[in-house]
């Protein structure tokens, strides 16, 4: 049986691991390192360099070296090299191809199957694009797994049967995730997850770069941001300084010949950066990790004291300020030191590959979807079919109907987010179900099904139950959710809960009124010869009042009109019932009597509860 590998495709570094005799082993690359920089360079001679060789030549080949492409995955971003445009998937595939080659060299056999990890807060387009990158690299992607979940799997598999609550704090090169999981008896279950797709070690590096640029400009008057080669050297020096400050109180940043002055004299950059200064210029970045942590605790419905262990993932968690913050947030809990933050995700991915291949027994991984999914229904309401933090894979269906008579098609708009009003959420995609046969409103039955697979990729199907006709969309367009969008979704959902509830109630009241008007008008038309004139005039007046209220903005008037119309409709039904009863008593024909009894049953439809229509 062909072997499967686990791959941590990171923003700044990537790792590949494989099971050897049931135990995960991190594979060293051809340069002898266990981590591979996620950097791709196109040399001028046509050669494509990946990893450390690409990083080594970045200063002299700035425009043709691509780094941190993971931040663009799932978007329409492209980079042009020699007249050809490359997508993030294609660049990521180059890194995956190198990892694949290194694993094949280590194992001495061809590799085709892989489990690839992504940040837990990656939305659908980003997951789909990651899978596509694997396919471009010649890999059969068995599963897309969330990074914190993989880390918990690697950490918790040998911890026995005792149930434990694990907090995974994952700060990588470009993304941040925090997840709460329960581990016990071979089951790894995600309780809640949150994060920021645009926060990572790169942002800390950039603050050092900005600090150096400002210092150099103040001393020499020269703006280094206009010099691409100088900026590349600054980026490399910043990363090195950040790493040194994790173990030292200060570091020296010395870059000779960084640029030249107006007289072509060479200039040197020589600065001392203390850990205190570094923490000061990056304090706001650190603070951005607090809100997702609090959100996860709230969503999981636990207190901080319920956390048994804290696992730090990602090289950026080596910064002392990060581990100090985690201690503060968890009430002084010491983060676990038994895992390598750079490698633990790949190890977990290899274990999951082993589970899928049958090499690892009695392990069940239960992941979740990070944000709610639903469609827009009548009144602009967001009807959620799948709530956030629902265990995946999952499938949910709900039946909707048309809003107008003889409506030939329905537009299905798929949204992701927490707000009650659809327009306030993120539109993932839309499609149309056409060919609905002419029918009165409320008659067609449209079944909408949301299916999230184990990779977290969404499929939506709309089916006309009457004709069997259906249409499907696999959500794969759109771009990644920015921090602002994610914050807005969750914060707005809390701040505007009352407003959203009122809007939803208003939409439901209006739908109810329209339905009652429609049903009553139809009932009068169908029973015109049986309706007493005085009763009919009262009902028609109530209908007119309801229509007038619906044309206005006063929801209280709509409610009052609905109540009045419901009362008059009931009187209408009662009048017809009594008239038919009198006819039956006067008749001596049993068959006629029986027929009239049937009509009595038909008339009772008025008393049935009115359902809110959705489209």
Swiss-Prot record:
Q: Which GO terms describe its molecular function?
A: ATP binding; ATP-dependent protein folding chaperone; unfolded protein binding
SUPFAM superfamilies for the chain: Actin-like ATPase domain, Heat shock protein 70kD (HSP70), C-terminal subdomain, Heat shock protein 70kD (HSP70), peptide-binding domain
Q: What does this protein do, in the record's words? A: Acts as a chaperone.
UniProt keyword annotation of Phosphoprotein present: yes
Low complexity bias located where?
580-598
- Expression induction or repression: By stress conditions e.g. heat shock.
Region Disordered: list its residue ranges.
Answer: 580-615
Ordered alphabetically, the record's keywords are: ATP-binding, Chaperone, Nucleotide-binding, Phosphoprotein, Stress response
| InterPro entries from the UniProt entry | ATPase_NBD, Chaperone_DnaK, Heat_shock_70_CS, HSP70_C_sf, HSP70_peptide-bd_sf, Hsp_70_fam
Q: What is this protein called?
A: Chaperone protein DnaK
Q: Where is the composition biased (Acidic residues)?
A: 599-615
**Family according to the record:** Belongs to the heat shock protein 70 family.
Q: Which organism is it from?
A: Nocardia farcinica (strain IFM 10152)
């Amino acid at each position: 049986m062909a072997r499967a590998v686990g791959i941590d495709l990171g923003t700044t570094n990537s790792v590949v691991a494989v099971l050897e005799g049931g135990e995960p082993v991190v594979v060293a690359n051809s340069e002898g390192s266990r981590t591979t920089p996620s950097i791709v360079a196109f040399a001028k001679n046509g050669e494509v360099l990946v990893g450390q060789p690409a990083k080594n030549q970045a200063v002299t080949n700035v425009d043709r070296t691509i780094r941190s492409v993971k931040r663009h995955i799932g978007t329409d971003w492209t980079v042009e090299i020699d007249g050809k445009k490359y997508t993030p998937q294609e660049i990521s595939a180059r890194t995956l191809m190198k990892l694949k080659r290194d694993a094949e060299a280590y194992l001495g056999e061809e590799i085709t199957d892989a489990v690839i990890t992504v940040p837990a807060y990656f939305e659908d387009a980003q997951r789909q694009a990651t899978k596509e990158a694997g396919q471009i690299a010649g890999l059969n992607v068995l599963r897309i797994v969330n990074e914190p979940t993989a880390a918990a799997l690697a950490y918790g598999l040998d911890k026995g049967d005792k149930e434990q609550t694990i907090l995974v704090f994952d700060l990588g090169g470009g993304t941040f995730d925090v997840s709460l999981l329960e581990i016990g008896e071979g089951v790894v279950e995600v309780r809640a997850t949150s994060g920021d797709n645009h926060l990572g070690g790169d942002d800390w590096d950039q603050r050092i770069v900005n600090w150096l640029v400002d210092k150099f400009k103040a001393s020499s008057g020269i703006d280094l941001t206009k010099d691409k080669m100088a900026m590349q050297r600054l980026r490399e020096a910043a990363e090195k300084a950040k790493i040194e400050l994790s173990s030292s109180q200060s570091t020296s940043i010395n870059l000779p010949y960084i640029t030249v002055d107006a007289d072509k004299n060479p200039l040197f950059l020589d600065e001392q950066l203390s850990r205190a200064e570094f923490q000061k210029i990056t304090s706001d970045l650190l603070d951005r990790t607090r809100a997702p942590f609090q959100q996860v605790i709230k969503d999981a419905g636990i207190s901080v004291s319920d956390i048994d262990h804290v696992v730090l993932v990602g090289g950026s968690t080596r910064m002392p300020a990060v581990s100090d913050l985690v201690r503060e947030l968890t009430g002084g809990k010491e983060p676990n030191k038994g895992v390598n933050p750079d490698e633990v995700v790949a190890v977990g991915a290899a274990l999951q590959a082993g589970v899928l291949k049958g090499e690892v027994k009695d392990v069940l991984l239960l992941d979740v979807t990070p944000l709610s999914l639903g469609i827009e229904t009548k009144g602009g309401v967001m009807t959620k079919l799948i709530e956030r933090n629902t265990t995946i894979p999952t499938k949910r269906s709900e039946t909707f109907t048309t809003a107008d008579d003889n409506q030939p098609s329905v537009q299905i708009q798929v949204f992701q987010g927490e707000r009650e009003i659809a327009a306030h959420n993120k539109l993932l995609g839309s499609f149309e179900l056409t060919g609905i046969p002419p029918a009165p409103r409320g008659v067609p039955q449209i079944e909408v099904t949301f299916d999230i697979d184990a990779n977290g990729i969404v499929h939506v199907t709309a089916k006309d139950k009457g004709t069997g006709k259906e249409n499907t969309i696999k959500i794969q367009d759109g771009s990644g959710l920015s921090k602002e969008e994610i914050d807005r979704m969750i914060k707005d959902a809390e701040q505007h809960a009352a407003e959203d509830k009122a809007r939803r109630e208003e939409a439901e009241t209006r739908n109810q009124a329209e339905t009652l008007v429609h049903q009553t008008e139809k009932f009068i038309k169908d029973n015109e010869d049986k309706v007493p004139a005085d009763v009919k005039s009262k009902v028609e007046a109530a209908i007119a009042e309801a229509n007038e209220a619906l044309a206005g903005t006063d929801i209280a008037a709509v409610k009052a009109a609905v109540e009045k119309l419901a009362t008059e409709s009931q009187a209408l039904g009662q009048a017809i019932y009594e008239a038919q009863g009198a006819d039956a008593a006067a008749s001596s024909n049993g068959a006629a009597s029986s027929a009239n009894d049937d009509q009595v049953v038909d008339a009772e439809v008025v008393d049935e509860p009115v359902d809110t229509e959705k489209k």
